[in-house]
């Protein structure tokens, strides 16, 4: 049986914890769980900074045990579909956020100079180019770049193997 588990609860921060394997070994992991934001930030930390911090943790490292889990998706309560009012105080337009942060992350890891693993990338609209629906709407045709982000992760994995000995 292969696998690992991570003990974490929803947080509005980037934090370090441990990733535990099925045979008892543990490795450090940095988690970007900045998901409930307003106007692009929470408690002074922007979503862009959270993505960058998580990627920087594994960037160019020689330590194969360094992992990150980058939760690229989020909900921006200032950009809610329902008349600008946040649903239950937490839910905003996730197609709006996917449009911004999927594209940003894809561009960052797909750049020629990027070397390193991207860790675990969690996203809304994986492999989808456009949203089909979102909260408060029956139809949304916003470009969400889920296809570009999946492609960037796959390309980076291939690029890393080819370029690590340059």
Regions found by a protein language model. Give the residues of each.
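Catalytic cores of phosphodiester-bond hydrolases, prominently lipid phosphodiesterases
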Residues: 1-166
């Amino acid at each position: 049986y292969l696998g690992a588990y991570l003990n974490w609860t929803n947080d509005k921060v980037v934090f370090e914890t441990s990733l535990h394997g099925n045979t008892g070994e543990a490795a450090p992991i940095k988690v970007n769980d900045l998901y409930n934001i307003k106007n692009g930030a929470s408690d002074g930390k922007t979503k862009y900074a959270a993505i960058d911090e998580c990627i920087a943790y594994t960037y160019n490292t020689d330590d194969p045990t360094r992992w990150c889990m980058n939760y690229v998706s989020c909900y921006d309560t200032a950009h809610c579909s329902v008349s600008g009012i946040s649903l239950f105080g937490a839910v905003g337009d996730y197609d709006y956020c996917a449009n911004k942060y999927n594209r940003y992350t894809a561009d960052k890891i797909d750049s020629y100079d990027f070397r390193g693993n991207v860790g675990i990338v969690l996203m809304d609209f994986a492999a989808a180019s456009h949203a089909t629906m979102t909260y408060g709407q029956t139809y949304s045709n916003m470009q969400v770049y889920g296809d570009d982000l999946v492609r960037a992760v796959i390309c980076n994995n291939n690029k890393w193997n080819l370029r690590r000995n340059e």
